[in-house]
Structures are given as C-alpha cells and as structure tokens.
C-alpha cells in the first residue's frame, strides 16, 4: 500500500518491456502505473469497490460528460471554482462558505452514493483522498485547497 508515484519518478516504467500487449495492474490504487504505461490492453484491479466503480466510470463516460457533471455540482452546491490555498484568502467568510458547501455536498453524496459525485468529492477532500466511516459514509474533511 502506498504511493507508486514516487516509484515512477525513480524509473519504474523504464524497467518494463517496450512492447506490452497486455498490462495487468493487480493492485492498481489510483492506476498511476497503468496511466503511465503504454500497452495494447489493460486489466486494472483493486480490492476497493469505490476504485472499481471509478474505473467503470472512466470506461463508461466520455470526458465531457464527467466534466459537465462536475461543473453542475460546483454550481449547484456553490463549491469553489478557483484553485486557491485557503491561507491565501483574505476573505475568511469565503473560506467558511466553501467549507460549508463541501459539507453539504458530502452529506448529499452520503445519501445518494453516485460515483460521479464521489469523483467530484475527491477533488475537494483533504489531499484528494477518500475515507469512509463504519456506516459507509464518506468522511474526509474539506481539503486545504479550495479547489484541489
């Protein structure tokens, strides 16, 4: 378990054959290794059901559909549109407004459990991570960036 991005920076991809027919990513996680490997076919797997649903999402929907859904949720819930560190904001009320918008959207997600909303939530959650409590509710706090 861990961040494979560091391994990629250290040259992991260069260790792979140049012509890969089928790349099997058994413990894919974020799929960063798969996304940085050229192959004719990919098999991506992970034990986490939420990640599996994301893999299906990316296969099922085109980028514009996903982006339009994210934009609609940003507008609907008043989520931050700009990418700004919270500590750079002069207006402290704006920080609270964005934090409350995130919490409202998180609450909505926990009631409806839509994978497109799950993906959107991760943009705004702390360190773009996800975590669930014992009841299965998404419980990551709002991230340090207003839009991450």
Language-model region placement:
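Aromatic pocket-lining residues of Rossmann-like dinucleotide-binding sites
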Residues: 37
């Amino acid at each position: 378990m861990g961040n494979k991005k560091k391994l990629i920076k250290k040259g992991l991809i260069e260790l792979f054959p140049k012509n890969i027919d089928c790349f099997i990513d058994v413990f894919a996680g974020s799929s960063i290794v798969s996304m940085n490997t050229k192959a004719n076919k990919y098999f991506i797997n992970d034990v986490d059901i939420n990640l599996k649903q994301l893999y299906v999402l990316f296969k099922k929907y085109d980028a514009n559909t996903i982006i339009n859904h994210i934009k609609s949720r940003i507008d609907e819930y008043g989520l931050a549109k700009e990418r700004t560190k919270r500590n750079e904001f002069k207006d402290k009320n704006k920080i609270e407004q964005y934090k409350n918008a995130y919490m409202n959207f998180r609450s909505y997600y926990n009631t409806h459990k839509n994978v497109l909303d799950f993906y959107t939530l991760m943009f705004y959650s702390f360190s773009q991570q996800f975590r669930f409590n014992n009841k299965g509710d998404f419980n990551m706090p709002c991230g340090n960036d207003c839009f991450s």
